[in-house]
Amino acid sequence: MTSSGTIDISDGTVLRLTSQDTSAALDASLFNGDGTLVNATDGVMLTGELNTNLETDSLTYLSDVTVDGDLTNTSGTVSLQNGVAGDTLTVNGNYSGGGTLLLDSELDGDDSISDLLVLNGNTSGNTTVVINPITGIGQPTSTGIKVVDFAADPTQFQNNAQFSLAGSGYVNMGAYDYTLVEDDNDWYLRSQKVTPTPQPDPEPTPDPTPDPDPTPDPIPAYQPVLNAKVGGYLNNLRAANQAFVMGRRDHAGGDGQTLHLRVVGGRYHYTAAGQLAEHEDTSTVQLSGNLFSGRWGDDGEWMLGAVGGYSDNQGDTRSNVTGTRADNQNHGYAVGLTTSWFQHGSQKQGAWLDSWLQYAWFTNDVSEQSDGADHYHSSGIVASLEAGYQWLPGRGVVIEPQAQVIYQGVQQSDFTAANRARVSQSQDDDIQMRLGLHSEWHTALHITPTLDLNYYHDPHSAEIEEDGSQISDDAAKQRGEIKVGITGNISQRVSLRGSVAWQKGCDDFAQTTGFLSMTVKW
């Protein structure tokens, strides 16, 4: 039999490849160049040896086909893809891999439907698998989605074939990445973080044998693998709510100033959800000024001011599981009002209150090379109420305990990502709390060193929802900060201040921030 085009095999037809000459003719004509064997219907049986070693632009469609003999696919492409998951290719002889296998599959949980390769003989070779996601929203898996079934008796047949996903080795749906995992001779698509193999038992065995109480809970067998873009969404959300946060000395009115320019640049990193390495570079410029001021009682003082700012933040997320990377960026503006009250004036010993409220809006971008780019917006209110007591023990020393409550209400808009997943913010707002101690020392040289010690507590983490799956960064709910700085007077009206702050918290959180500000009084 010879052919230079396409042979269509109808439903129920048997193509018998029993002659060596026939097989050779098929290899030379049907499966050479652009020749393609197409099976568009169910129930076809091929009897004999089938060799699919094609040219690079050729394809063998074997959807719902039984090969009652050997299947050799060492350099060709076998496809079950027809836009519908659930087709089966059964090989009753030996299978030799090395080429490519194309499959349709739903990508949800363990009960997802997928095309299936059933092997009933000896297997060998490395086959590259290309998954076409038909539908699904992405869900964690336990057992996984079976795509290769070694149905032969392992005591009589050898199973040496290896299967791996094309490209990065992962396929994405929604918030999760799936990879191929071998389990009991079969192959499954799983969103699974591989748990390291336990270390061998110590030699010699401890005597007596440890008996911990309570008994530790076992580590879950499977931990879902998150797509790197999830970290980008979390990075943008955290940066938007932190960009314009300030204390009473960071704006005009809080320390008797009339005009205050503040420039902030920083870098932080942490591990989100136990597997996403987050990095972020932040920069913010804020300009504030007094609008009104007046006396309060005998020697008290109050001030009302305005503030505006711009922030640009860029970061990246790298999966510790897959090695894939996503980039994120957001930039935005904020405008608002500030108020300050001093019991005995800003330069005297006594209690004080400081507050501000700003409306912020951002444009956000998250991109990943194999998963496209996402563009969306976020906006909302950030506000603060801060209280402290300025104690002047003498010799130019200032010691000031502080407490601050910060409302973080910047929320991202709902949007559809490039992978067709629906992304929203599941935690609407948050309250951040800070306890601190500020100290400074005024010298005769008009230079004032400063030292701040702060403790931050975030009751909630940044949290998003992607196609019904809620993911939290679980990062740095508690962290400490040390900030050192110096203030110098250029003239009676103008002063400069610079400082550097270091933060450290749980989940590998670390942040370094530099501050530079100029104040003008008149």
Give the positions of each predicted feature.
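Detector for outer-membrane/organellar transmembrane beta-barrel domains
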Residues: 350, 372-465
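Residues that define the transmembrane beta-barrel architecture of outer-membrane proteins
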Residues: 117-119, 123, 255, 279-285, ...
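Extracellular beta-solenoid/beta-roll
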Residues: 1-128, 132, 137-193
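Short beta-strand-to-coil "C-cap" segments at the C-terminal boundary of structured domains/repeats
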Residues: 149-151, 190-196, 290-291, 519-522
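Outer membrane beta-barrel transmembrane domains
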Residues: 336, 420-522
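Outer membrane beta-barrel translocator domains of Type V secretion systems
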Residues: 201, 207, 211-395, 399, ...
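Short secondary-structure subsegments characteristic of cysteine-rich extracellular domains
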Residues: 138-155, 276-293, 422-428
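Outer-membrane beta-barrel and related beta-rich outer-membrane complex signature
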Residues: 143, 273-275, 316-320, 365-369, ...
